[in-house]
Amino acid sequence: MVRELCEVQGLIFKRKKYKEADILTKIMTKDHGIFTIDVRGALRPKSRLGAATLNFSYGKYIVNTNWKGISSLRTFKDVKQLDQLYLDLTKNAYSSYVLDLLDHAFVEYKDIGSFYDLIMKALLKINSGEDVAVITQMVQLKLLNAYGVAPQLDRCLICGKVQGTFDYSLELGGIICSDHFNSVSQRMHLDPKVVALIRTLALIDIDRLGKVKINPQLKKNSGKVIDRMYANYLDLNLKTKKFLDELALF
């Protein structure tokens, strides 16, 4: 396939050294999915390309590509940076994990559809100071759909009930209403408030998530349940998640 110059709208992440003065970095794009670009001379002093491809930079990038393998960056325009994600260790860790989850859900150059807007909005919210844990949990839940293992959270698995008190079953992959608690032995016996929070984060649009204040213990418990979903449904072993868990210990 012939290589061509193409302008893409995207965000930079996963930057690493390549050869003597180059870097390889991932870019999440609006229309062409996630792919790797070679940024030549990025590590040289005063490199304009290097400055425009720091992690969490976003804008328009002109790449030389044949839509497979490694593309190369030629130039850029209108590039900005989500500076708080770059400078703040906690925000950096959560944002890196969110992008890592997205990266593992898709092959390179595959259109990621609405997940581009989801991730960009999540990162913008984190950058502006909104609750990083709540936003990350929302993204985790929504990305289960990208992996093809989304649980049924909108209604009871047994009878289809949409309102009331619910529990969750990892084995069955969805919520169970209180009418069927006695008949489902595989349920997790969760606090109904935890299930309610998980349902809300999974089902509402990220635009509707305001600057909410959630009880820290409730938030911690919902995070543990979501982690169990990932452990049960997916075989992921992400360094970004390990670092995030280690960070939470301090």
Swiss-Prot record:
The name of this protein is DNA repair protein RecO
Which organism was this protein described from?
Lactobacillus gasseri (strain ATCC 33323 / DSM 20243 / BCRC 14619 / CIP 102991 / JCM 1131 / KCTC 3163 / NCIMB 11718 / NCTC 13722 / AM63)
Q: Which GO terms describe its biological process?
A: DNA recombination; double-strand break repair
- Entry-linked SUPFAM superfamilies: ArfGap/RecO-like zinc finger, Nucleic acid-binding proteins
Disulfide-bonded cysteines:
none
Keywords (alphabetical) are: DNA damage, DNA recombination, DNA repair
Q: What does this protein do?
A: Involved in DNA repair and RecF pathway recombination.
Q: Which gene encodes it?
A: recO
Q: Name one GO cellular component term.
A: bacterial nucleoid
Q: Does the keyword Metal-binding apply?
A: no
Q: Does the keyword Ribonucleoprotein apply?
A: no
Regarding protein family, the annotation reads: Belongs to the RecO family.
Q: Which HAMAP family match?
A: RecO
The record ties this protein, via Pfam families, to: RecO_C, RecO_N
